[in-house]
Each structure stands twice: as structure tokens, then as C-alpha cells.
């Protein structure tokens, strides 16, 4: 079994760019940014429970990274960058820390490196279970209307929230709930030590209005790019800013 993905081929000899979306996104999420880099081959992945991979269920991060590795092999991707947002960034960091042959580097936008104590994990598990129950039982428009009121999305205006609620409500609530629980921050290890000891290039992107993740970025041994005029979802709020940073990272 492999993950559903869209592949776009570029020039031979350059590494692939493998894009991983955030929770409730899909393989289209990164394409406005990725298609600027047409010289590179691009793989836009649907994570389990999402898009074309909605029917794929997992029990945890090991299952996700295993599926990602099989997907890369199936496309004969030998050299690549992982570019991930939020959940996709956490998957990218997890996979990279486990060791991936052919990995050139990791670019994470607003991805959490992991909680650091049991109390935080317990609180997060309780919160994620409550959200998962809502995703399973309530209309998605109602759930996402509340989801995008969370403090991390404070930089969004009303129009942006309405657009995201409409877009994300096309998902399957049950499969989103299962993926939310399987990849909860409550079950993700703290990756800070592994990231400090890494052997791969590591870059971190965060919006200038995303105070929570700017603070987290300062804890990581990574080159940080602060995206102007953007909050947590920087590649959506300021795609040109993310494109500029990615071009600098890739020396495009």
C-alpha cells in the first residue's frame, strides 16, 4: 500500500521536492508554491485520512513514515527534500529523524517538535479526543468554524476563515478524526535532541504573526525564515514570501 500523490516531473539531475500538507488539507495545498519550482520534480502527497488517501488508516507515526517511504520508492525517488506544513511538518521531522536514504534536507512550516512533559501530553490527548469526537459526529462546517477560532489561527480575518471552513468541510470527518488521534502531539516524541544531532539540512519557516511557533523555532537548531504578513498558515497567507524563502534554501 502507498499513499495517493500527484507527481509533476522536472529536469533530470535535481532532487525531488516532496510536499506534505497540514491537517485537513490535501495534495493541492502546496501546489501554488511548488509549481514555481518547475525545474524540480514535485510530489504532492495525500496523508492518511485525507484526499485520495482517505481510506488509509494508521495506528501512529511509524505507520505514516512507513507509508511515506514506500510511496517514495514506488515513484523511484532517490534524492529529495521534504517540505511540510503543520502536521506535514511533524511527519517530515519524524521521518527524517528515523533516517531516510536520499534525504537532502527538511523544510518545516509551523510544525511542532514535540511536547516536553506528561502534563502537556495529557492535556493535548484530552483536547484531541474531544475534537475527534466532534469530527466524527457533527457537521464539518460547524466543527471547522470552531477549529479556526483557536488561538493559533488568530491572524486570520473573517473572510479567510470562511474560505477555509468551506474548503476543509469537503473532508471525511471519521477519517480526519482517526488521523488526528493517531498523530496527536500527545503521542509524538519530543524531537529536539534528535534534530540537534541531525545529519540533514533543516530549515524552519513561520509567519511573523505566529508568536507560538516563532517561540518554538527559537528552541530548534535550524535556520529560521520568518515570513512577513503571515500567521500560522504562511504558505496560504503569503505564498510569495514562502516561495522566496524556499528559493533561497534551494538556491533556485
UniProtKB/Swiss-Prot annotation:
One matching Pfam family? Abhydrolase_6
Q: Which reaction is the catalytic activity of this chain?
A: 5-enolpyruvoyl-6-hydroxy-2-succinyl-cyclohex-3-ene-1-carboxylate = (1R,6R)-6-hydroxy-2-succinyl-cyclohexa-2,4-diene-1-carboxylate + pyruvate
* A molecular function GO annotation: 2-succinyl-6-hydroxy-2,4-cyclohexadiene-1-carboxylate synthase activity
Protein keywords: Lyase, Menaquinone biosynthesis
Pathway(s) where this gene product acts: Quinol/quinone metabolism; 1,4-dihydroxy-2-naphthoate biosynthesis; 1,4-dihydroxy-2-naphthoate from chorismate: step 3/7; Quinol/quinone metabolism; menaquinone biosynthesis
- The organism's superkingdom is given as Bacteria
Q: Which InterPro entries match?
A: AB_hydrolase_1, AB_hydrolase_fold, SHCHC_synthase_MenH
Q: Per the UniProt entry, what are the Gene Ontology biological process annotations, in alphabetical order? A: menaquinone biosynthetic process
Q: What is its EC number?
A: 4.2.99.20
Q: What does this protein do?
A: Catalyzes a proton abstraction reaction that results in 2,5-elimination of pyruvate from 2-succinyl-5-enolpyruvyl-6-hydroxy-3-cyclohexene-1-carboxylate (SEPHCHC) and the formation of 2-succinyl-6-hydroxy-2,4-cyclohexadiene-1-carboxylate (SHCHC).
Q: How does the record describe its quaternary structure?
A: Monomer.
> What HAMAP family does the record point to?
MenH
Question: What family is this?
Answer: Belongs to the AB hydrolase superfamily. MenH family.
Q: What is this protein called?
A: 2-succinyl-6-hydroxy-2,4-cyclohexadiene-1-carboxylate synthase
- Name the gene: menH
Amino acid at each position: 500500500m502507498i499513499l495517493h500523490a500527484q507527481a509533476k516531473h522536472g529536469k533530470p539531475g535535481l532532487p525531488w521536492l516532496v510536499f506534505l500538507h497540514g491537517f485537513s488539507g490535501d495534495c493541492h495545498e502546496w501546489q501554488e508554491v511548488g509549481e514555481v519550482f518547475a525545474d524540480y520534480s514535485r510530489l504532492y502527497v495525500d496523508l492518511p485520512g485525507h484526499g485520495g488517501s482517505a481510506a488509509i488508516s494508521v495506528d501512529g507515526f511509524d505507520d505514516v513514515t512507513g507509508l511515506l517511504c514506500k510511496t517514495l520508492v514506488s515513484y523511484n525517488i532517490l534524492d529529495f527534500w521534504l517540505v511540510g506544513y503543520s502536521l506535514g511538518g511533524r511527519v517530515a521531522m519524524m521521518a527524517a529523524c528515523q533516517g531516510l536514504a536520499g534525504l537532502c534536507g527538511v523544510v518545516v512550516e509551523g510544525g511542532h517538535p514535540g511536547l516536553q512533559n506528561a502534563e502537556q501530553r495529557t492535556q493535548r490527548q484530552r483536547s484531541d479526543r474531544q475534537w475527534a469526537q466532534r469530527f466524527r459526529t457533527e457537521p464539518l462546517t460547524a466543527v471547522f468554524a470552531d477549529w479556526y477560532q483557536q488561538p493559533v489561527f488568530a491572524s486570520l480575518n473573517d473572510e479567510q476563515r470562511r474560505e477555509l471552513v468551506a474548503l476543509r468541510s469537503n473532508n471525511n470527518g471519521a477519517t480526519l478524526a482517526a488521523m488526528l488521534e493517531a498523530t496527536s502531539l500527545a503521542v509524538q516524541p519530543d524531537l529536539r535532541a534528535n534534530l540537534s544531532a541531525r545529519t540533514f539540512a533543516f530549515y524552519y519557516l513561520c509567519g511573523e504573526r505566529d508568536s507560538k511557533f516563532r517561540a518554538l523555532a527559537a528552541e530548534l537548531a535550524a535556520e529560521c525564515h520568518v515570513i512577513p504578513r503571515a500567521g500560522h498558515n504562511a504558505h496560504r497567507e503569503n505564498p510569495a514570501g514562502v516561495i522566496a524563502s524556499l528559493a533561497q534554501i534551494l538556491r533556485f
